[in-house]
From Swiss-Prot:
It comes from the Eukaryota. It comes from Homo sapiens (Human). This is Late cornified envelope protein 2D. The lineage of its organism: Eukaryota, Metazoa, Chordata, Craniata, Vertebrata. Keywords: Keratinization. Precursors of the cornified envelope of the stratum corneum. Belongs to the LCE family. Induction: By calcium and UVB. Skin-specific. Expression was readily detected in adult trunk skin, adult arm skin, fetal skin, penal skin, vulva, esophagus and tongue. Not expressed in the cervix, rectum, lung, colon, or placenta. Belongs to the LCE cluster present on 1q21. The keyword Ion transport does not apply. GO terms for biological process: keratinization.
Length: 110
C-alpha cells in the first residue's frame, strides 16, 4: 500500500500542460514566389493590331496570331459551334474596312 502511494506521488500533476515538441509543424505553408507570371498585362488593349500579331486583352484572354488581327472570343457557346468555317471557332479576322478585330464583353468582334 505504501509503495503504491509513493508511485502516485512521484507522477507529475495532471494539470501541468505538456511541453511542445521542438519539431512542431509550421503554421504557414511555404512562401509563394514573389511574383507569379501574369497571363495578361492590364495596360494592353483588348484589340489586336495587324503589326502586333498577337496580344492579350482583359476580357478576351488572348488573341490569335493567324491573320494578324484575329482575336479570341471570351465566351464559347456550344450553340455557335455549327457556324464553323475554315478558321477555328474562337477566332475572328480583321474587318475588311481595316479595323482590327476587337473582343467585346459579349464575345463578339467589331
Amino acid at each position: 500500500m505504501s509503495c503504491q502511494q509513493n508511485q502516485q506521488q512521484c507522477q507529475p500533476p495532471p494539470k501541468c500542460p505538456p511541453k511542445c515538441t521542438p519539431k512542431c509543424p509550421p503554421k504557414c505553408p511555404p512562401k509563394c514566389p514573389p511574383q507569379c507570371p501574369a497571363p495578361c498585362s492590364p495596360a494592353v488593349s483588348s484589340c489586336c493590331g495587324p503589326s502586333s500579331g498577337s496580344c492579350c486583352g482583359p476580357s478576351s484572354g488572348g488573341c490569335c496570331s493567324s491573320g494578324g488581327g484575329g482575336c479570341c472570343l471570351s465566351h464559347h457557346r456550344p450553340r455557335l459551334f455549327h457556324r464553323r468555317r475554315h478558321q477555328s471557332p474562337d477566332c475572328c479576322e480583321s474587318e475588311p474596312s481595316g479595323a482590327s478585330g476587337c473582343c467585346h464583353s459579349s464575345g463578339g468582334c467589331c
